[in-house]
């Protein structure tokens, strides 16, 4: 079975793919030996994906608000820090409302992930009741982890988002969930690859951010200050931004700004710690250096109210 969720203009560098076309064609090869293909109709280049998937013996399609799909979701809604939606296509005699699904992870973009997982599970004979239990308890360490301060003034989201597609999904989802909240976004860009991210990421983040903090993120053999300056050079308009190379110090500064500068008395301030998730290693030079994970830093620092 081969599942195709999405395609973005990423992974193009001297050590990855030379062009987007090469990357896309490589990704489409997942269907070459698949008896069953699962395709998200919400992906870019969907016609080419469906053409490649047509070689499979069985094609299952999924999508959000795509009634033409084999399985599709409607009425996506936030329930606290979880997501609920109605699932259609399970059987011919289902109710018009469909099956109610609770997804125990934040981010409405995760509905597409869930639909692909549901389709794959159904294809191998797993029943919907077991699927519903699994999705309701689903958690990936460092993936859309929500940490809320005890006083409710700050909500931190820790996620592995690190490219244009994941940034677009995450930031738009956060804005829909917290439309009145100031947003502080902390991120960097990896060294030695995917040069285009240094232009794309600040441009994706800026429309949603009140402050961007650029910091160290797996620089490898590149100068991390150079990477951060290139990010800063691509900030559109006049979105406030700063560079703090030390990642722990940058996280500390983000929470300080959330407490002292970027405040809405009627809504929590959102702090986004992006790209590193629950990782405890940083790629520096030719080594992987131990660090405290973003998730650990969030839990440790979110309730600090006194700053130097």
Task: State where each predicted segment sits.
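Flexible active-site lid/hinge loop adjacent to a nucleotide/diphosphate
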Residues: 1-52
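Extended acidic/charged loop-beta regions that coordinate divalent cations
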Residues: 1-14, 48-100, 133, 140-150
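A conserved, hydrophobic alpha-helical segment in the catalytic core
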Residues: 1-9, 99-139
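Residue-level signal for inorganic ion chemistry
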Residues: 5, 23, 38, 73, ...
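Short gly/ser/thr-rich secondary-structure transition/capping motifs
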Residues: 18-22, 67, 138-140, 195
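Transmembrane helix-bundle segments that form internal channels/tunnels in multi-pass membrane proteins
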Residues: 40, 91-93, 104
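Short, polar loop motifs at secondary-structure junctions
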Residues: 41-45, 64-65, 278
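ATP-dependent carboxylate-amine ligase
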Residues: 58, 116-142, 146-308
